[in-house]
Amino acid sequence: MLSFLSSNLSSTRQSLAQVLNFALVLSTAFMLWKGLSVFTASSSPIVVVLSGSMEPAFQRGDLLFLWNRSPRAELGEIVVYNVRGKDIPIVHRVVRTFPQIEGKAKKVKEVTEASSVPPNMLLTKGDNNIADDTELYAKNQDFLHREEDIVGSVRGYMPMVGYVTIMLSEHPWLKTVLLGIMGLMVILQREQ
């Protein structure tokens, strides 16, 4: 009887240790993500290119590293933005800037680097697209606000690494298979 209680206690202890290890892995990943978010000043410091609109600069599945500490975006800079009301990151190039004058947007010629007017409003376009992004913006929005809409500027990338994310979102059954394999590995590891 005592050996039964001892083995039960040992099994419970092992299960608790596995749960705590799993929680430790999750909390470490979360803390690293939040730390990276604070360091880059971006709510999403790493994003995956979801379409071919930026080819040949970036391919679908490329993993992008963002930085959002620059107060202004320059012409030609590649930025990631979210459309208001939607949570889909769009990666496109700044093709025009508009200075903010008395709270309203005023179209002017493209701002050059020598200009002293801070460009707070941007127009973007995918390198592989024919037209600019005004059709993608929210209703009654003709430009992006640098402070409100921009998630970050691209500072680096890793080709094709993000394709796993795309495959998992396009084929939901792969998530089930992956979770099943992970669960099977936990069960098999426990038996050893």
Curated annotation (Swiss-Prot):
Q: Which family does it belong to?
A: Belongs to the peptidase S26B family.
Ranges per topology, Cytoplasmic = 1-18
Write down the top EC class of this protein.
Answer: hydrolase
Q: State how it assembles.
A: Component of the signal peptidase complex (SPC) composed of a catalytic subunit SEC11 and three accessory subunits SPC1, SPC2 and SPC3. The complex induces a local thinning of the ER membrane which is used to measure the length of the signal peptide (SP) h-region of protein substrates. This ensures the selectivity of the complex towards h-regions shorter than 18-20 amino acids. SPC associates with the translocon complex.
Where primarily located?
endoplasmic reticulum
CDD domains in the record: S26_SPase_I
Q: Where in the cell is it found?
A: Endoplasmic reticulum membrane
Give a GO biological-process term. signal peptide processing
Quote the protein name from its UniProt record: Signal peptidase complex catalytic subunit sec11
Q: State the gene name recorded for this protein.
A: sec11
Q: Which reaction does it catalyse?
A: Cleavage of hydrophobic, N-terminal signal or leader sequences from secreted and periplasmic proteins
Give a GO cellular-component term.
Answer: signal peptidase complex
Does the record bear Transcription in its keywords?
Answer: no
**What transmembrane ranges does the database entry give?**
19-39
Q: Which PANTHER family match?
A: SIGNAL PEPTIDASE COMPLEX CATALYTIC SUBUNIT SEC11
Active site residues per record: S53 (charge relay system), H92 (charge relay system), D133 (charge relay system)
- Where are the residues of the annotated region C-terminal short (CTS) helix? 177-188
Q: From which source organism is this entry?
A: Neosartorya fischeri (strain ATCC 1020 / DSM 3700 / CBS 544.65 / FGSC A1164 / JCM 1740 / NRRL 181 / WB 181)
Spell out the NCBIfam families in the cross-references.
Answer: sigpep_I_arch (TIGR02228)
Keywords in alphabetical order:
Endoplasmic reticulum, Hydrolase, Membrane, Protease, Signal-anchor, Transmembrane, Transmembrane helix
Topology check: give the Lumenal ranges.
40-192
Membrane topology value:
Single-pass type II membrane protein
